[in-house]
Amino acid sequence: IVSAGTEVCLVVGGGNIWRGREAENLGTEKTTGDYRGRMATIRNARCLQSFFENHGLVTRVRTSIPVAQCGEPYIRRRALRHLEKKRVVIFAGGIGSPFFTTDTCAALRAKERNCDGIFMGKNGVEGVYDDDPRKNKNAKLIKKITYSELLADNLKVRDNTAVGLLVDSSVDVRVFNRN
């Protein structure tokens, strides 16, 4: 894809391992759990960077929280310059604030860059469904849906903040099973 001239940037997830019930069971408050999740995304970004560079791609990790030895600080114009130079840019640390998901970060970075699309890897689902297919075997795959319909129907393939950011955009989202 990169050799064909496509600018590629990735938003890395991985924070869910520290949030939700697991964090609560450890007595961790939500804010602390979210920051631990941000650090997990930085770790995952470094793993991806190594993998890509071992396969001949030039990459840069940009972090939204300061971790100088692990990645460059996120500065929009510098990230754009890396893309112009045909480098793969890997965004880590979410948007740098608690209570916002990696989905929101992907939507924000896509809008900042005027991206054509987002490929969103989800755990165990092949797309958007009318109900959770892991809980309802009769859930139906929805082939095409607008952001406004996602919000109105309260479908939870991604969080509503991320969907809200994209309502007035032309960014196309494709959901795929990352497993």
Q: Which role fits each region the language model picked out?
A:
Residues R77-Y129:
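Internal active-site segments that recognize and position negatively charged phosphoryl groups
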Residues A23-V89, T104:
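Ligand-binding beta-strand-loop-alpha-helix segment within the catalytic cores
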Residues A40, R46-H55, L108-D116, L165-S169:
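Alpha-helix C-terminal capping segments
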Residues G15-G20, A68, P98, E126-Y129:
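Short, active-site-adjacent cap segments at secondary-structure transitions
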